[in-house]
């Protein structure tokens, strides 16, 4: 039995969100194929994600200097512990599905806040004399990114979404990365439904081997 972490970042309800609806199609097919797997849901707009702020940086600095968590200020303890909770949940998963829209050639700010909360030195990567090394490598972990945007940006230099997520997953050691991208729905609204159905087919296929 595998543990799937299903992370969404979208303000729109399922009924009108293209990325969420494609993600939902993936999830239904995935659970048909893997009925015994655990699925843990994280909604980055609903579930509070601790951002890196002055208290977090101060707390990390004290910990690196040899202090214990108990000696930090109340705010430092609370916020650092919350970051660790996010990272530990991420580490506990075997598979990851991220469902996102494109905002201004990248991601919503909440998504970057989440990545910052799980890409943590000593948790998901470490430093060595030869450079940073992902601590999640060679463990059979998989990542699927379901992403939508209104134009045609995928595969171009201007796309700071899919390539970034693939890179940061690899940085932590998760190298089995696949994406399902729905794009062009605003640029060519007459073909929006056709584009969506093509993405749904890709999502179903991904679910069958994920």
UniProtKB/Swiss-Prot annotation:
SUPFAM superfamilies referenced in this protein's UniProt entry, alphabetically: Flavoproteins
Keywords of this entry: Flavoprotein, FMN, NAD, Oxidoreductase
Cofactor(s) required, per the database record: FMN
An example molecular function term from Gene Ontology annotations: electron transfer activity
The organism's place on the tree of life at top rank: Bacteria
Coiled coil: none
Binding note for cofactor: Binds 1 FMN per subunit.
InterPro entries in the record: Flavodoxin_fold, Flavoprotein-like_sf, FMN-dep_NADH:Q_OxRdtase_AzoR1, NADH:quinone_OxRdtase_FMN_depd
Keyword flag NAD: yes
Protein EC: 1.6.5.-, 1.7.1.17
Enzyme class: oxidoreductase
Amino-acid positions noted as binding FMN in the UniProt annotation, renumbered to this chain: 17-19, 102-105, 148-151
Reaction(s) catalysed (UniProt annotation): 2 a quinone + NADH + H(+) = 2 a 1,4-benzosemiquinone + NAD(+); N,N-dimethyl-1,4-phenylenediamine + anthranilate + 2 NAD(+) = 2-(4-dimethylaminophenyl)diazenylbenzoate + 2 NADH + 2 H(+)
Oxidoreductase among keywords: yes
Gene3D superfamilies in UniProt: 3.40.50.360
Family label: Belongs to the azoreductase type 1 family.
Known partners and oligomeric status: Homodimer.
Biological role: Quinone reductase that provides resistance to thiol-specific stress caused by electrophilic quinones. Also exhibits azoreductase activity. Catalyzes the reductive cleavage of the azo bond in aromatic azo compounds to the corresponding amines.
HAMAP family listed in its UniProt record: Azoreductase_type1
This protein's name: FMN-dependent NADH:quinone oxidoreductase
Organism: Citrifermentans bemidjiense (strain ATCC BAA-1014 / DSM 16622 / JCM 12645 / Bem)
Gene that encodes the chain: azoR
């Amino acid at each position: 039995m595998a543990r799937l972490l299903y992370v969404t970042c979208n303000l729109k309800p399922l009924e009108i969100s293209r990325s969420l609806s494609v993600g939902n199609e993936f999830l239904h097919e995935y659970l048909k194929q893997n009925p015994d797997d655990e699925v843990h849901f994280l909604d980055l707009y609903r579930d509070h994600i601790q951002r890196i702020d002055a208290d977090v940086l101060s707390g990390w600095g004290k910990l690196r200097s040899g202090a214990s968590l108990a000696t930090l200020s109340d705010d430092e303890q609370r916020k650092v512990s919350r970051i660790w909770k996010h990272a530990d949940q991420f580490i506990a998963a075997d598979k990851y599905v991220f469902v996102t829209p494109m905002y201004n050639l990248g991601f919503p700010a909440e998504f970057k806040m989440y990545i910052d909360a799980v890409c943590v030195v000593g948790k998901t990567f470490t430093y060595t004399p030869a450079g940073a090394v992902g601590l999640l490598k060679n463990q059979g972990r998989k990542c699927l990114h379901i992403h939508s945007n209104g134009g045609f940006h995928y595969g171009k230099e201007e796309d700071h979404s899919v390539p970034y997520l693939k890179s940061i997953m690899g940085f932590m050691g998760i190298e089995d990365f696949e994406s399902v991208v729905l794009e062009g729905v605003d640029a060519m609204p007459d073909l929006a439904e056709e584009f969506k159905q093509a993405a749904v087919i890709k999502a179903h296929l991904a679910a069958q081997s994920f």
